[in-house]
Amino acid sequence: MPTINQLIRKKRQSGATRKKSPALQKSPQKRGVCLQVKTKTPKKPNSALRKVAWVRLSNGQEVIAYIGGEGHNLQEHSIVLVQGGRVKDLPGVRYHIVRGALDCAAVKNRKQSRSRYGAKRPK
């Protein structure tokens, strides 16, 4: 416990804040290549098979990215756009793949929240 004089001489240092998406290196998105596409099971109490992809980014770093929406066309060697955003029930998944960009197709027959899934406006 410091004395008052010690605190006057040198203020308390705040701890360094941890970055939420360090692999993007302050970019909004980064391009990457899918190394493998798999499913992961969420932690308790949820139950599902969530689609994820191991991606090597253009800066050489490898991350696990979540593939949102129903159905996808991704496979090994697909070029994808990755943005930040974690998946709460999948430990270690801190990135999302942008649907409708590069090799990742948009979600078909999507009526609501279309911009998140790259779907065009229905006629």
Curated annotation (Swiss-Prot):
This protein's GO CC annotations: ribosome; small ribosomal subunit
Lineage: superkingdom: Bacteria
Keywords: Ribonucleoprotein, Ribosomal protein, RNA-binding, rRNA-binding, tRNA-binding
InterPro entries: NA-bd_OB-fold, Ribosomal_uS12, Ribosomal_uS12_bac
BP terms from Gene Ontology: translation
Database matches in SUPFAM superfamilies: Nucleic acid-binding proteins (SSF50249)
Record-linked CDD domains: Ribosomal_S12
Keyword Flavoprotein appears in the UniProt entry: no
Transcription is among the record's keywords: no
NCBIfam families: rpsL_bact
Subunit structure: Part of the 30S ribosomal subunit. Contacts proteins S8 and S17. May interact with IF1 in the 30S initiation complex.
Purpose of the protein: With S4 and S5 plays an important role in translational accuracy. Interacts with and stabilizes bases of the 16S rRNA that are involved in tRNA selection in the A site and with the mRNA backbone. Located at the interface of the 30S and 50S subunits, it traverses the body of the 30S subunit contacting proteins on the other side and probably holding the rRNA structure together. The combined cluster of proteins S8, S12 and S17 appears to hold together the shoulder and platform of the 30S subunit.
Protein name according to UniProt: Small ribosomal subunit protein uS12
